[in-house]
From Swiss-Prot:
Works with phosphate acetyltransferase (pta) to capture exogenous propionate and regenerate propionyl-CoA during degradation of 1,2-propanediol (1,2-PD). It comes from Tolumonas auensis (strain DSM 9187 / NBRC 110442 / TA 4). This is Propionate kinase. It catalyses: propanoate + ATP = propanoyl phosphate + ADP. It is found in: Cytoplasm. Gene3D superfamilies: 3.30.420.40. It comes from the Bacteria. CDD domains: ASKHA_NBD_AcK_PK (cd24010). Belongs to the acetokinase family. PduW subfamily.
Amino acid sequence: MLQKIMAINAGSSSLKFQLFSMPDEQVITKGMIERIGKQDAFFSIQYGEQKHRETFAVENHQQAVDHLLSALLDHEIIKSLDEIAGVGHRVAHGGEAFSDSACIDAAALQQIEHLGTLAPLHNPVNAIGIRAFMEALPHAKAVAVFDTSFHQTMPPETFLYALPYRYYQEQGIRRYGFHGTSHKYVSQICAEKMETPLSDLRLISCHLGNGSSLCAIQHGRSVNTSMGFTPLAGVMMGTRCGDIDPSIMPYLAKQENKTADELNALINNESGLLGISGVSNDYRDVEQAAKEGNERAQLALKMFAERIRSFIGSYIAHMGGLDALIFTGGIGENSRTARAAICHALEYLGIALDETKNNANETFIQQDSGPVKIAVINTNEELMIARDVMRV
């Protein structure tokens, strides 16, 4: 029997949604509400061939949810709220408490809020969105889908930092990893397209966007990932520096009299492609500047690709080989030059890009003789959320 399942991604001032027919995985409607808390909040919704946009005042997430549900009725997308059988919520951090998506009850919601200490910008807002939908749709199944849970299969020798062990025991300091929903989804799709059981494959998923992370996936399980305790760690990103020598922070604090908050802003908001190029955090803008001869933009692109190649080599060693390299995310899916730069000089590892296939945006872009598949797969975190609502 078909069911209507809603996937929700609540941000500090936004609410993105998709309503699916499941299990046939058809999108019924999608849209978002932006500028929550403002007098000129913006609502957009798309269904069939119709698009509707409006501006109105929204004080909080509860009002945003109420407006969204009213719009579904007003536009006759549904006849009754009872038609919505379940709601899946993207939640940033599940810590060690959640190794999989979970049905939300009072105890689970309290745990999500408690984990706000690890994700203060995200978990509290995620919890607000959950409460708003649970109040508006008390009959509907509520499921939390965590960015971190896919990586809970990493072994301790991989997820622990070489700090005194008590900091892990008392403060939960360890590698958690993020983008798990995306990495999980594209690994499943890649296995389907390769017509090979996921349990037989060694994959590296490269989710590349303004935030970027890599994930080593062996037998369908995450065994390593580039992001760490926070989404700052790993490769160079739009405004985040990725891995650096930690001693740089106390050095800058002393030399430039910077506070902890100022240093945090520096490495999260002022670094990466933006910091090196001086042009933009948007890969497309940096790419254009590089074409026009901007040497710092050219350097930023080289650094971006080099950091990713280093992780690819490390993960191949970790898994003892590689069956497929996956590109996803805004950059991974859309920038043929980024894919080419990353794969450059990796032929000795079996990663041989076919330039014609890459430029044609085909799904598999490796040379015919290449032993490692190179796949370009559009991520769909909302669909993965809807699938998990049906599964758990």
